[in-house]
C-alpha cells in the first residue's frame, strides 16, 4: 500500500464503514448549505483541539469490493505539523514545509514538499475550511456506524485531473468528530480510514513530530522537492 494514500485518506485523520452511493443530485454543480453546516462544525471541533493523537485503520478495496490490504497506526497532529506511525515500520513526518516518508522495507526516506495549494486532504488541512475552495460538497443524509449516528458528506474535487473523484466523510452527528473517511480513485479502488481513541488534549513536543535522520541509520534519502 502506497504511503501517500494514508495522507490522502486521513487526514489521516476525525466502526465499519458503510459504502453508500450518493443518490441526491440536487446540488451537483453547487454547494449544499446543509453540508457546509456539518463541515463547519467539524472544522470548529478540530480547531478546539490543541494537539491530537488518534488511532486509525486504513483498508484498501478494489472495484469489486475485494480487500487488497489494511494498515493500522497512530497519528500525532499539532497545527500544520504531524507524525504518522504505521504498524510495520513506516513513518511519515511533516514539519509544515516538507514531508518525510520512511519505508522500513527499503530503508529509504522520500522527501517531498508540503504543498498547501493541492487538493489532497492532508492531516493539517482538516483544521481549515479547505472544502470551500477545493471541493463541491453535498449532504447525503444520515447513517449508522455501529451505535453512532453519522452525517454523510460527499466531496467532489474541483480539479478533475486529480487521481480521485470522490471523498465521503462520516461525521458524528452529536460530537461533530470525524469517524471515517472513504476515498474513491479513478482506478476503481476505495480507501477507507476509520479513527478511534481520539485525544484532543494530547501532550507531545514539536521534536517528536520532526524527522530526525539519526533515527534511521543508513537510510537512503530520495529528495523530490525540486
Regions found by a protein language model. Give the residues of each.
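Gly/Pro-enriched, hydrophobic low-complexity segments
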Residues: 22, 135-140, 144-225
